[in-house]
């Protein structure tokens, strides 16, 4: 139940971030969320300063949402172009995706998908955060400091693995993880205006798909998104 509510929470934030203001009735119809549930969610988001009420029926992005995810009109073009492609690719491959950005100090999530069979992970657990920060020119020492800060339960073994991955990222500019259970994670960076972004796909490896083919497909998708938004 908690995961379902969290999913609806993100659906509302995504819709308002991309489309701007909307009425509660419009949201309830488009997102297929019961109006009473939606009203409670929106009330919580207003208290958190993620949304603001324009009147009794209409809501809009609040400064908290704009700062949290850089989801103002400034970046709506990026989201409109990226999100449909990410959702389509994720559904086709039956894998989760994370789309995140870096404001020079903090990593923030812009969009994510969560399939029931793939347990959701954070931008740090997925390996996307160090990929983005490395592409932005952040030092290994600062990446390691933020890794410890954002994953307080990490062991020394986790730290050693992270350090080795940082070295790999410096050379490859992206990160591909794979396990014997065919669990894959592919994180790739790209730039949008002055902001460094990144996309990660992770979960059970697609059937009849090699690692090389999947890596290429992910790279081509990110390239198409980067090319589309560069024409803004």
Regions found by a protein language model. Name each.
Residues 17, 137, 141-145, 219-231:
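Short amphipathic alpha-helical signal-transduction/dimerization elements
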Residues 63-150:
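Amphipathic alpha-helical effector-binding/dimerization core
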Residues 3-6, 62, 75, 79, ...:
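Short, structured helix-loop boundary elements
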Residues 1-72, 227, 231:
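N-terminal helix-turn-helix
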Residues 56, 104-105, 193:
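Short strand-connecting beta-turns/loops that link adjacent beta-strands
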Residues 56, 97, 128, 184-186:
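Short loop/turn microsegments at loop-to-beta-strand junctions
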Residues 52, 98-100, 174-177:
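Conserved beta-strand cores of small sensory beta-sandwich domains that regulate signal transduction
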Residues 155-229:
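Extended hydrophobic
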């Amino acid at each position: 139940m908690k995961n379902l509510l969290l999913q609806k929470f993100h659906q509302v934030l995504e819709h308002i971030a991309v489309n701007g203001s909307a009425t509660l009735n419009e949201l309830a119809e488009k997102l297929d969320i019961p109006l009473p549930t939606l009203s409670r969610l929106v009330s919580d988001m207003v208290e958190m300063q993620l949304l603001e009420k324009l009147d009794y029926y209409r809501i809009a992005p609040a400064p908290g949402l704009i700062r949290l995810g850089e989801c103002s009109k400034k970046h709506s073009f990026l989201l409109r172009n990226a999100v449909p492609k990410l959702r389509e690719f994720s559904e086709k491959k039956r894998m989760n995706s994370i789309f995140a950005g870096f404001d020079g100090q903090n990593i923030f999530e812009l969009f994510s998908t969560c399939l029931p069979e793939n347990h959701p992970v954070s931008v740090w657990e997925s390996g996307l955060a160090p990929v983005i920060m490395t592409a932005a020119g952040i030092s290994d020492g600062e990446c390691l400091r933020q890794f410890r800060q954002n994953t307080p339960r990490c062991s020394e073994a986790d730290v050693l693995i992270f350090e080795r991955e940082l070295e790999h990222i410096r050379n490859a500019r992206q990160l591909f993880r794979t396990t014997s259970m065919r669990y894959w994670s592919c994180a790739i960076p790209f730039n949008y205006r002055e902001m460094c972004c990144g996309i990660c796909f992770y979960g059970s490896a697609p059937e009849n798909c090699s690692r090389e083919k999947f890596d290429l497909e992910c790279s081509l998708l990110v390239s198409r998104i980067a090319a589309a938004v560069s024409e803004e």
